[in-house]
C-alpha cells in the first residue's frame, strides 16, 4: 500500500558487489524485543552466507550489553562493545572499522530506546547514523501487541530520524494485529520480517497476502 520494497539480502548483495559493508541500524523503544531481533537477523544472515558483526551501541540501559553478548554468543556472532556510558557512535564506528578490516558484510547496530525519558536520544541516534556512514539501512523494531503505541512510535521515529523498513515482534501471540497494517499505511515503509517466537529461527519474511488472510480469515 504505497510502501516501497526493501530486501535486506538484496541490499547485502549489492553492498558486497561494491566491496562495501552494509550498516544496519536498529531503532525502537525499550521492551519491544530489539536485542533478540538483532540476534535473529544475524543468524539469518549467517545462514544465507553473510558475515555480520554486532555493535552494542545501547550503552545506556543496564544489562543491554550483556544481554546482546549472550544472544550473540549463542548464534555465533562477534560483538563490538565498550563500557556503559561510552559514546554509542564510537561503538558503531569501531564495529564498521572491524568489519572493513576483516572483510565482513554487515554491521548490525543496537541502539538505546529511552524515547520517553531522554530528549538527547534523538541527537544520539542522529550522530550514530552520521558516523555509521553509507550504505545504510535503518530498521524500526515494533511490538505487534502494542496497539495504538505502534503508530505513535512509528511516527516518532519517522519524524525524528526516519527509517527504511520495520520488523514486528510478538506476532505469534496474536495474529489479528491491525496496528501492523496501519503502520505500513501511515509510514509508507515496508515490513521486512515478523518475529513469531523466542527461538533464533523464529523470524519470517512478511508476506502481506498471508497476513491479510489471517486477519480476514
Task: Kindly give the residue locations of the regions a language model identified.
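Primarily NTPase-proximal linker/entry elements flanking Walker-type ATP/GTP-binding cores
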Residues: 1-57, 64-84, 91-100, 105-109
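Glycine-rich, flexible loop/turn motifs
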Residues: 4, 8, 75-76, 111, ...
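Short glycine-/small-residue-rich Rossmann-like dinucleotide-binding loops
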Residues: 30, 112-113, 143
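Conserved catalytic-core segment of NTP-binding enzymes
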Residues: 87-102, 116-217
Amino acid at each position: 500500500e504505497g510502501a516501497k520494497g526493501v530486501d535486506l539480502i538484496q541490499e547485502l548483495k549489492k553492498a558486497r558487489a561494491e566491496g562495501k559493508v552494509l550498516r544496519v541500524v536498529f531503532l525502537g523503544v525499550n521492551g519491544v524485543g530489539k536485542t533478540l531481533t538483532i540476534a535473529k537477523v544475524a543468524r539469518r544472515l549467517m545462514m544465507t552466507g553473510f558475515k555480520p558483526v554486532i555493535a552494542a551501541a545501547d550503552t545506556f540501559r543496564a544489562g543491554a550489553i550483556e544481554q546482546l553478548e549472550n544472544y550473540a554468543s549463542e548464534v555465533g556472532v562477534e560483538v563490538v562493545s565498550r563500557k556503559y556510558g561510552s559514546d554509542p557512535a564510537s561503538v558503531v564506528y569501531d564495529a564498521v572499522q572491524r568489519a572493513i578490516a576483516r572483510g565482513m558484510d554487515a554491521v548490525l547496530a543496537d541502539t538505546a530506546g529511552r524515547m520517553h525519558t531522554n530528549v538527547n536520544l534523538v541527537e544520539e541516534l542522529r550522530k550514530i547514523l552520521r558516523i555509521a556512514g553509507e550504505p545504510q539501512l535503518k530498521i524500526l523494531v515494533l511490538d505487534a501487541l502494542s496497539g495504538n503505541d505502534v503508530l505513535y512510535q512509528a511516527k516518532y521515529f519517522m519524524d525524528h530520524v526516519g527509517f527504511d523498513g520495520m520488523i514486528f515482534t510478538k506476532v505469534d501471540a496474536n495474529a489479528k494485529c491491525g496496528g501492523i497494517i496501519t503502520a505500513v499505511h501511515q509510514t509508507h515503509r515496508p515490513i521486512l520480517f515478523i518475529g513469531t517466537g523466542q527461538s533464533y529461527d523464529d523470524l519470517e519474511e512478511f508476506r502481506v497476502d498471508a497476513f491479510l488472510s489471517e486477519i480476514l480469515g
